[in-house]
Design a protein with these regions (language model features):
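Proteolytic maturation boundary segments
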Residues: 4-5, 11, 17-33, 215-256, ...
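M16 family metallopeptidases and their MPP-like homologs
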Residues: 37, 42-55, 64-66, 82-127, ...
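Active-site SXXK
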Residues: 63-77
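Short, polar/flexible loop-turn hinges at active-site or ligand-entry regions and domain interfaces
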Residues: 75-76, 127-135, 354-355
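Non-catalytic, conformational "gating/processing" segments within enzyme and secreted inhibitor domains
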Residues: 141, 194-226, 423-424
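His/Glu-based metal-binding/catalytic segments typifying zinc-dependent metallopeptidases
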Residues: 149, 166, 235-293
Length: 439
């Protein structure tokens, strides 16, 4: 039964997507924004809370705090014993998790619809009564250290993402990955964690988004019962205002490690999500890298056999993000040859208009991806919260696709010429160091 519920919530297509996704939204007096989407196609409900805090809200010397709290806030609360948080949801036949980005931290509980009250109680406990104390802090320090060792330090090409950020951002706090610095976490005192919690984990910095088999009026009553009494935060919520300079000249570096085959990474600065040019850039990256027939894969992997794999994706962020392009060189291929091949693909979208046939295929891919993002209750709840947080307009869940459809072939060429330039990029070579490999 448990596996069935989780599978339904995560994978079942949302039958009514062809119609608008209907929702209601309102604010509690304490500033908590609430979004409700009613859907009775399956007896499940996604109870989610998005806190508008990510690694960009951290200070130099105290990095990793946002991601650390993603772990710490499963430790328990004044009314939930240590290690008992997940058991409540699992015993009810549901699943729960959380994730942290540069811009937000997102918690979700996927439960049978008759357990809506349980999900609301658990999330209210996280917001009001979480245990931020030495025992949990020390426990999670070790958990996060092990995560860093597994995902970054001992993972092939594990430094790819952190190195891309630190080279691309010199002013903005996007310069570090959400995992942060273990030295910073070790240096943080208990009062640092308490202050972080009291600053960011407050109703006026959160969105409660619920999607699924609910009675909206009953849900509102339960929300009022569990959240209306939580005090509004009194601390000023810091938001970075620094703008990362762009087009300052190409940045090149070599990162030596134990990885056997050369990896090339290029990072191009792009506009913030939601701007007209962003949609053109995002479509370009889909053109270059989405699927086996995409340009990078077709030309550099299949035809020229320069790379074992090659791709690009949009690292879209609340503030201006990046296009990240990467290629793993085939055995015996000079990394400079692979870089030249990657650059040739970027140059082509600058010099040649995309054909009508390829453009129509691209539009179809964009539309399919948009539908897929909102094909589960959890996906709908997250999208509604994201659109409200980043744009102040949750209805973009229905209309953002129109912004993509307004992009023309000429817009693609113009965006490529503006953003895919050498002076606007970082180029990193990840090469094998025989001395490290032998140790």
């Amino acid at each position: 039964m448990k596996k069935l519920l989780v599978s339904l919530c995560l994978a079942l297509p949302f039958a009514g997507f062809a119609q608008n996704i209907k929702f209601t939204e309102y604010d509690l007096p304490n500033g908590l924004h609430v979004i409700l989407h009613e859907d009775h196609s399956t007896p499940i409900v996604a109870v989610t809370v998005l806190y508008h805090v990510g690694s960009k809200n951290e200070q130099v010397g105290r990095t990793g705090m946002a991601h650390f709290f993603e772990h710490l806030l499963f430790e328990g609360s004044e009314n939930i014993g240590r290690g008992e948080y997940a058991k409540y949801v699992e015993n009810a036949g549901g699943a729960l998790n959380a994730n942290t980005t540069q811009d937000r931290t997102f918690y979700y509980d996927l439960v049978p619809s008759n357990q809506l009250e349980l999900g609301l109680w658990l999330e209210s406990e996280r917001m009001l009564h979480a245990k931020v104390e030495s025992v949990g802090i020390e426990t999670q320090r070790e958990v996060v250290k092990e995560e860093k060792r597994m995902r970054y330090d001992n993972q092939p090409y594990g430094q790819l993402f952190p190195e891309a950020l630190s080279h691309a951002y010199k002013k903005h706090p996007y310069a570090w990955a959400p995992i942060g610095s273990m030295e910073d976490l070790n240096a943080a005192k208990d009062e640092d964690f308490v202050n972080f919690y009291k600053t960011f984990y407050v109703p006026n910095n959160a969105v409660l988004s619920i999607a699924g088999d609910i009675n909206p009026e009953q849900a509102k009553q339960l929300i009022d019962r569990y959240f209306a009494g939580i005090p509004r935060g009194t601390k000023a919520i810091p938001r970075p205002t620094v703008v990362e300079p762009t087009n300052l000249g190409e940045v090149r570096d070599t990162i030596w490690g134990k990885d056997e085959l050369p990896m090339i990474l290029e990072a191009y600065h792009i506009p913030a999500q939601g701007t007209p040019e962003f949609y053109a850039v995002d479509m370009l990256n889909t053109l270059l890298s989405n699927g086996q027939s995409s340009r990078l894969n077709k030309h550099l992997v299949d035809e020229k056999e320069l790379a074992l794999f090659c791709g690009a994706f949009t690292f879209n962020l609340e503030d201006p993000g990046l296009t990240l392009a990467f290629g793993l060189a085939n055995m015996g291929v000079d990394p400079k040859t692979l870089e030249d091949g990657m650059n040739a693909e970027f140059d082509q979208v600058k010099s040649e208009l995309v054909s009508e046939q390829e453009f129509q295929k691209l539009r179809n891919q964009i539309e399919s991806d948009f539908i897929q993002r909102n094909s589960s209750m959890a996906g709908i709840a997250e999208s509604l919260a994201n659109y409200h947080t980043y744009y102040g307009n949750a209805n973009l869940i229905n209309t953002e696709i129109e912004r993509y459809m307004k992009v023309t072939r000429e817009d693609l060429t113009a965006a490529a010429k503006k953003y895919y330039t050498p002076q606007n990029r970082v180029v990193l070579y990840f090469l094998n160091d025989p001395k490290l490999s032998s140790n």
